[in-house]
Amino acid sequence: MAASNKIHLLKDLLILSRFNKYTPVFASFAGLWSTLLAGAARLAEHPSAISPAFVLRQTGLCFLAAYIFYGAGTVWNDWVDRDVDANVARTKDRPLASGKVTTFQAMLWMVLQTLATWYLLNVMLDGNDLYVLNPLHALMIAVHRIKNGRGTDGCTYRWKHFLPVLVASFLYPFGKRPAARKLYVYPQYILGFIVAWPAVIGWAATYGQHQPFTETVRQCLPLCSMVYFWIIYLNTAYSYQDVADDRKMNVNSFYNLGGQHLHLLLVALASPVPVCMLLFLREFDSFWLWATWLGGWTASFAEQLIHFDPKEPASGGTLHKSNFMLGIWTIFACAVELLRSASKV
């Protein structure tokens, strides 16, 4: 009986983190694209500096870190929103809202996921394979660095990458409150930043401390901006599925800004995406990227906006799934670009 209860609890915790759905993968897209393309760029600049295997390893670690941290963020979101979720048809069965998971269990689960993310971030930004194989050895190295006065610099470097998304994840659920609307703050603003920021981490995972933090941010700014507007666009359509319940509960969401002109709002939100994409891709001398990114995204956006129907809120879910496939396609395009760069070495 005890074993059965533990299995049910584990299942509920996984559901609480949305690990039973495809949505956590969205949090990894920017990091994956950035890691792969940074690898392709560095191979082109300094072929002997890294190997494709290293880039793929860093890509895998970036995926795990973003995926797990998304889970931690949803735990915090659901805890803050538990009373609201209990009165919304789509969310009333979530583990915290339904009482299947206690606050203590949820908070412990959230802390464990946050610590796991921090550990993976340390591995990525240090680039040390031994950290994966032997955590005790990693601790010994950290102590040795501190004794020699080199521990704080590395820690500060890693915190620069982790703290922004940590703070944004904390603030996200409060962006849905009516008070936030008075300040013209919508949750999609914060969510866009959360999903876009891993692009900086992914680029740093390839270039490491060979590149200053400010230069990494500058390099990734067009990609971060592109992902930022993309997430606001697709999440506005996705959250519109709950429009009836949200209005009853006075939940703040960006689609309220569109009023009766939601379709035009989505067009306006989608428009900056290809512009930011152009700014990012101009750094790469690759027809393949121009064709697969700009061509693929433009065609997909046109199809999405044609089929979205404000009279059918469920069409927002279809648009969301279409963008998920677009993200998967872009991973493939970036992986091919990495292989193309490796073949020229």
Curated annotation (Swiss-Prot):
Keywords for this protein: Membrane, Transferase, Transmembrane, Transmembrane helix
Listed pathway(s): Secondary metabolite biosynthesis; terpenoid biosynthesis
Biotechnology: Diterpenoid pyrones display various biological activities and FDDP C shows anti-cancer and anti-HIV activities. FDDP C also shows inhibitory activity of 42-mer-amyloid beta aggregation that is involved in the pathogenesis of Alzheimer's disease.
UniProt membrane topology term: Multi-pass membrane protein
EC number from the UniProt entry: 2.5.1.-
Entry annotated with the keyword Transmembrane: yes
GO MF assignments: transferase activity, transferring alkyl or aryl (other than methyl) groups
GO biological process: terpenoid biosynthetic process
Membrane-crossing segments per the record: 24-44, 60-80, 101-121, 183-203, 220-240, 261-281, 286-306, 319-339
Co-factor(s): Mg(2+)
Pfam family of the protein (one): UbiA
Cellular location(s): Membrane
Record's GO cellular component terms: plasma membrane
Annotated function: Polyprenyl transferase; part of the gene cluster that mediates the biosynthesis of diterpenoid pyrones. The first step of the pathway is the synthesis of the alpha-pyrone moiety by the polyketide synthase dpmpA via condensation of one acetyl-CoA starter unit with 3 malonyl-CoA units and 2 methylations. The alpha-pyrone is then combined with geranylgeranyl pyrophosphate (GGPP) formed by the GGPP synthase dpmpD through the action of the prenyltransferase dpmpC to yield a linear alpha-pyrone diterpenoid.
Family of this protein: Belongs to the UbiA prenyltransferase family.
Protein name in UniProt: Polyprenyl transferase dpmpC
Organism: Macrophomina phaseolina (strain MS6) (Charcoal rot fungus)
